Swiss-Prot record:
ZnF locations on chain (C2H2-type): 1-21, 27-52, 58-83
Protein known as: Protein cubitus interruptus
GO CC term (a single one): nucleus
Major localization listed first in the record, in broad terms: nucleus
Domain of life: Eukaryota
Higher taxonomy: Eukaryota, Metazoa, Ecdysozoa, Arthropoda, Hexapoda
SUPFAM superfamilies named among the record's database cross-references: beta-beta-alpha zinc fingers (SSF57667)
Localization per record: Nucleus
Basic and acidic residues compositional bias, start-end: 110-121
Entry's family note: Belongs to the GLI C2H2-type zinc-finger protein family.
PANTHER family assigned to the protein according to its UniProt record, in alphabetical order: TRANSCRIPTIONAL ACTIVATOR CUBITUS INTERRUPTUS (PTHR45718:SF4)
């Protein structure tokens, strides 16, 4: 300003000085009903504290000094004149903030923080969980896992409730209340076969490939289960494993069943089995030879080797259907295998073929259906037949004289 030669180190001080030349007073009194305005905040604070209240919030921070002032300008003047410019330059003379709404809240917070410091409790929000974890962690290791859960329920509210709650409980009480249960003793490997049928079905559904690995998985699981029983000193033969269905108990019967199914699906007439024989030499076969060869043939079927060509001089051509074939008769009785496996095994040697006639011509009929008659086919084709009759279940050839 023209005619003024004052200099200031801070821009704010220069602006405040310029207001004295311009007459600008942007700081008005905040007290209700008071309309006084001031050019700087220091003068306004001095007015409010002196006129509208008797507080002196600005305290000298010098050691041993108890002076209090209503405005910061009076405090600065006191520090410069009494304690020296060096003490003022270190900014150790700053007092408390103004006596407004924000300053009151800040003073309340500082007072509550001071009370917490007297109890050796850190009131910062970041250290609430860690401090509770430290207190709980000194009781026992099992409480450490519960400290994170309990800290969320005991958060500090202005630093008062948390201190009261922690002082009412001792570490021993926390250890008794927050003691964890003992861990369950679980087996490392749980076999699917050991589970009940309902749970095992659910496991198979969830796996997605239960149909492909049901038989192999059940066998392996059953072997592991029996080996574990033997290591524990338990006789597995005396234990009834009724809940574990054995889908492959008799391997020979299953393989024989599979072999018969393959023979049925071969490119023959609807599953009929043919053994090539010569019609010229079939008449010359003796009943004893045919009896021996047929016995060998039936034993071969039961020994899981399939049905092969009869050795020896039997080369006549005949056909076996579901009524005169041991293998086909067994296949017909295989339908009752699901209900009883023991009756399936016992029914093999007691079955006897029923006399019927076979033809050399191919006919499309169901070999399993017992109601099919071969006599109509015999009459239509007009071919000679050989009757196989036996009381012991073995066929004997009778020569047809009409041939």
């Amino acid at each position: 300003f023209e005619g003024c030669f004052k200099a200031y180190s801070r821009l704010e001080n220069l602006k405040t000085h310029l207001r004295s030349h311009t007459g600008e007073k942007p700081y008005t009194c905040e007290y209700p009903g008071c309309s006084k305005a001031f050019s700087n905040a220091s003068d306004r604070a001095k007015h409010q504290n002196r006129t509208h209240s008797n507080e002196k919030p600005y305290i000298c921070k010098a050691p041993g000094c108890t002076k209090r002032y209503t405005d910061p300008s009076s405090l600065r003047k006191h520090v410069k004149t009494v304690h020296g410019a060096e003490f003022y330059a270190n900014k150790k003379h700053k007092g408390l903030p103004l006596d407004d709404v924000n300053s009151r809240l800040q003073r309340d917070n500082s007072q509550g923080r001071h009370n917490l410091q007297e109890h050796n409790i850190d009131s910062s929000p970041c250290s609430e969980d860690s401090h509770i974890g430290k207190i709980l962690g000194t009781s026992s290791p099992s409480i450490k896992s519960e400290s994170d859960i309990s800290s969320s329920n005991h958060q500090l509210v202005n630093g008062v409730r948390a201190s009261d709650g922690l002082l009412t409980y001792s570490p021993d009480d926390l250890a008794e209340n927050l003691h964890l249960d003992d861990g369950w003793n679980c087996d490392d490997d749980v076999d699917v076969a050991d589970l009940p049928i309902v749970l095992r079905a659910m496991v198979n559904i969830g796996s997605g490939n239960a149909s492909a690995s049901a038989i192999g998985g059940a066998v392996l699981a059953r072997q592991r289960f029996r080996s574990r029983l033997q290591t524990k000193g338990i006789n597995s033969s005396t234990i009834m494993l009724c809940n574990i269905p054995e889908s492959n108990r008799t391997i020979g019967i299953s393989e024989l069943n599979q072999r018969i199914t393959e023979l049925k699906m071969e490119p023959c007439t609807a599953g009929d089995i043919k053994i090539p024989m010569s019609t010229n030499t079939a008449i010359e076969v003796f009943p004893e030879d045919l009896l021996q060869n047929h016995t060998t043939f039936r034993n071969t079927v039961l020994n899981k080797q399939g049905i092969s060509t009869v050795s020896g001089s039997v080369q006549g051509q005949f056909r076996r259907d579901s009524q005169n074939s041991t293998a086909s008769t067994y296949y017909g009785s295989m339908q009752s295998r699901r209900s009883s496996q023991s009756s399936q095994v016992s029914s093999i040697p007691t079955m006897r073929p029923i006399p019927s006639c076979t033809t050399t011509a191919a006919s499309f009929y169901d070999p399993i259906s017992p109601g099919c008659s071969r006599r109509s086919s015999q009459m239509s084709n007009g071919v000679n037949c050989y009757a196989f009759t036996s009381t012991s279940g073995l066929p004997i050839i009778n020569k047809d004289l009409n041939a």
